């Protein structure tokens, strides 16, 4: 009996998609994997419009993105490119850009928008409801507020909350009742946007935690480091373009002080030395009595 062979044929659209992904991967110096799982279509379109001029975003199947990354790594002789695959999660997409990884992370973070929290979701931070009027008339909503632990009452014909109250701590799972209350109060504790999973540049894949920088804190540390280095350079007399002027000024001041103290007359010290001598003479004369000074002094 002859052996029957079956040939597996790859769908042409998959081949085209992989080739399209490869073009994207080769088009930018910086490639990012991002998570798009929780982004509603309306917000996604807004984000696309915001980032269109600075980066290219493409969604695809994880298996096809993985294949494209592996082929680009092989074709370019750059095996480190495959490190991106380790960052891949369900719902991932690719971004190609010329931005540096830190600026890319900041841009994507700033494109996020507030969103309501869903039942069963984890609170990203302490959720606090401030005291004051809800603007709603008396009705069933009063009981809903009390059911989630809010000190609510009727005030001036409207439902009001008596005091600031934290209804969920960071990490708490939000109940269905609380999610409804927060939605009615138009409180949006969530942020919807593109979350960075990993960014590749020059053989390095950056974890998002590395890219998350407090700019004010970083600037303060940079200024502190500069001041420390500047002082060290001046005190150790290590001339640099930034410190040479201060070093020369300090050396001149020290030399002048020594010259004055040693009564060594120069064009720079003569006035100070004579002034010092005069002051000393007057002090001695004062101790000796008024007759010690002639009329000219």
Swiss-Prot record:
Keywords: Ribonucleoprotein, Ribosomal protein, RNA-binding, rRNA-binding
Any one Gene Ontology BP term: ribosomal large subunit assembly
SUPFAM superfamilies, A to Z: Ribosomal protein L10-like
Superkingdom of origin organism: Archaea
GO cellular component terms, A-Z: cytosolic large ribosomal subunit
Entry-linked Pfam families: Ribosomal_L10, RL10P_insert
GO molecular function: large ribosomal subunit rRNA binding; structural constituent of ribosome
NCBIfam families: PRK04019.1-2, PRK04019.1-5
Purpose of the protein: Forms part of the ribosomal stalk, playing a central role in the interaction of the ribosome with GTP-bound translation factors.
Record family assignment: Belongs to the universal ribosomal protein uL10 family.
Complex and partners: Part of the 50S ribosomal subunit. Forms part of the ribosomal stalk which helps the ribosome interact with GTP-bound translation factors. Forms a heptameric L10(L12)2(L12)2(L12)2 complex, where L10 forms an elongated spine to which the L12 dimers bind in a sequential fashion.
UniProt-recorded name of the protein: Large ribosomal subunit protein uL10
Source species of the chain: Methanococcus voltae
